[in-house]
Amino acid sequence: MDISGFLKENKESLKDLKEDDINEILEDYEIDNINDPKQKIRFFKQVENTRKRLKIEEKNRMLEEDINRMYEEEKNRMLEEEKKEFLIKVEEEKKEFLTKVEEEKQKLKTEVEDLKSIILTSSTKNGDLKGTTSYSELFKIKNSLKLIEENCEFKDWNIPSGIELKKHVINLDDCNQESTMQSKLDEYFKDFNKKRKLIITNGTKIKINSIISNRYCDYFINQKGFPFEPYWMHMVGDIKKGSISSDTNLDQVLKYIDIIVEKSNHHVLNRPMFGFLMNKTKIKFVKYDIENNKYYITIDYDLRIGFQYLSNIMIYLEQFIRNIPNSLQTILKNHTNDSVEFYYGATSSVFIVNKEFVYKWFNYPYFFQTEVKYLTFIDGIEGTPSIKQQNQTENWIQISPRGQLIKNLEGKPIDISFYTKVFCRNTQKHTSREVIHRDIRLSNLLMDSGGDPLLVDFGFANFTENEEFYQGTMNTASNRIYNILINNRTNHAFSVVESDDLESLVKVYIMENEQAVKRTIKSIPNSEIGLFRTMWEFFNTECFPQYSTLFQQAQNINYEELKNEFIKIDKIKNTTTTSNNNQNHTNIHKNTIANTTSYTNTLETSTTNPNTNTTTSDTNTSTTSTTNTNTTTSNTITA
C-alpha cells in the first residue's frame, strides 16, 4: 500500500489534522513500508505529539486575544474618563462665558439708561430737541473717551482667523461639516483684510472694474464723500443683524444713517441706500385704514436714531408703497390688524406678515425667473415655494408658510455653530446638483418658526459649467473671485466653482464671531502660544480624527503674528483714548483755575467796597455756583 492509500485508510484517525500538519510529519520520517507495525506506531505517536502542539498553540492564541481585549477595554475606559473630564471643563467654561455675557448685557442696559437721562436733561434744559440733536450725536458724545479719533473708518474692522470657531466645533457632538468650511480660514482672513486696507490707504477713489456692465461700476470711498458704494452699508447692516455688537460698529451704522439722510436732501437715493435706511430705523407697518386708504406706521427707536430723520423717511416710504404690486397690496390689506415687516434689497423685497407668511417681491422679471428655475431644479416642483407671476409684470414668491428669521426657538438661544453646520449642509446640497448660489450673505440665511433653516434669494444662481460675469455681493465673494476682481483684470468672465458658495459662508461666519475670536487670541500668554499646536495635534490623533482637516489647519495658523496685530491695534486705540483723557483733564483744570480766580476777585471786591459787601458777595457766589453746575453737566455728558 502506498502512502496515499494509507492516509485514506486512516482518514478517521487523522480527521482533526490539517493536510499541512500530516505532510510535515511524513517529511520527518523516511517510511519505506508504511504498513510495518513499528513504523505505524512511530507515525501515530508523532501524530499525537502534533495534536498536543496544536492545542498549546490554540490556547496561547486565545490567551493573547484575552489580553488584547482587556487592554482595549482599559484604554476605552481611560478615554471615557478623559472625555467626561473634558466635557465638565467645557461646561464650566460655557457657564463662565454666559456669566460674562450677562454682565455685558447689564452694562449695556446701564449705558442706555444713562443715555436716556442725558436726553431728558437736554430736553428739559432746551425746552425740546426740536430736531437739532440726533441720538447718534448724543451717543458719540457720551462715548467720546472710548472711541478712537476716526471711529467710523473701516481700519478697525479686522477679520481675524478663528481659534474661537474651532473651540465651538470641539464642543459639539456632530459638526464635521465645519471642517470643510474652515480649512482655508487663514487664507480668507489675509485677503479679506487686504481689500479693506486698500480702500482706506488709497484715498477717496478706488475704482473696481465693472462687474456686470458700466452702469453697475462702483467707486469705493470713505464715508466723508460721495458717491457712496451701497454694498459696504449692506455689510454693516448684516453684521448688526448678528449676535456680535460693539460700540465701534454701532457708531458706524449710525454714521451711515447720518450720511444717507444728508445725501437724500440733495440726491435721489438708490434702492440699496434706501433699503439700508429702512432696515436700520426698523420701520413697521402696523395697520391699514381701508376707508381713508392710509397706513399707520410705528418706528422702533432701539438704534437711537434722531427725530429729524422721521420726515425724510416717511416721504421715501410713501413713494415705495405706491410701487408695490396690486396683488401684494391686496395681501397686505387682508392683514389689516397684523404687523408687516419690510426688508429691502437691490433685486427684491421681503414682506413678513404676522410672522406667519413671508413674501418676496422681485424688482425685475429676470431675477424672478432665475430663482424659480434653480429652486425647481434643486428641490423639484413639490419642494419649491409657492410661486405667483401675473402678466410678466408682477413677480413674487411665498418663501415660507411658517414664518421668518427668529432670534429664539422655544425660549432657547440659537447655537450659531449648529446652524452654520446646517446651512453648510444645505449649501452642499445645491452644489452637488452643480448649482451655485453666488450671493450667500447673512440676510439670505433665514430660519422659519419651526426651526428649519432656509437659504433664499437664488436670483444670482447659475450652473457651474456656465461662463459669464460675476454677480453677487462683493463683501462675501469667495477668495478666488475676490482675487480676480482686486487685481483689476479687464475680463471678469470665468467659470464658477462649487467651493465659491462655501467660502462665502465662511466669511459670513467670521463676521458673526469676530469679537469673540479677537478676545480669545489676545488672552493667550506669549509663553503658551506654542501649546495650541500641540493641543490641536492631540485632538487630531487621539480624540476627534474625523475633524482631521480642521485641526491640521488650526496648527498652521500663525498665532504670534495674529496676536501682535491685535495688540498693535489696541495700542493705537489706547493712545488716542489717553490723549482724549488728557485733553478733558486739561479743560477741567482750566475751569477750576477760572473758578478760583473768580472767588479771589470776590474777596478783593468785598475788602475794597465794604458798603456793597453783602450784595457783591452774594452775586459772585451765585456766579461761582452756576459755573460749578455747568462743569458738572459737562462731565456728565463726556463721561
Curated annotation (Swiss-Prot):
Molecular function in Gene Ontology: ATP binding; protein serine kinase activity; protein serine/threonine kinase activity
Domain Protein kinase stretches: 233-588
Region (Disordered), start-end ranges: 601-639
EC number from the UniProt entry: 2.7.11.1
Active site location: D439
Keyword Lipoprotein: no
Cystine bridges: none
Signal peptide: none
Record flagged with keyword Cell division: no
PROSITE patterns assigned to the protein according to its UniProt record, in alphabetical order: PROTEIN_KINASE_TYR
Keywords from the named record: ATP-binding, Coiled coil, Kinase, Nucleotide-binding, Serine/threonine-protein kinase, Transferase
Coiled-coil segments: 7-122
Catalysed reaction equations from the record: L-seryl-[protein] + ATP = O-phospho-L-seryl-[protein] + ADP + H(+); L-threonyl-[protein] + ATP = O-phospho-L-threonyl-[protein] + ADP + H(+)
Sequence positions that bind ATP: I239, K240, K241, G242, S243, I244, S245, S246, D247, K284
Enzyme class: transferase
Family of the protein in this entry: Belongs to the protein kinase superfamily. Ser/Thr protein kinase family.
Protein name in UniProt: Probable serine/threonine-protein kinase DDB_G0282777
Organism: Dictyostelium discoideum (Social amoeba)
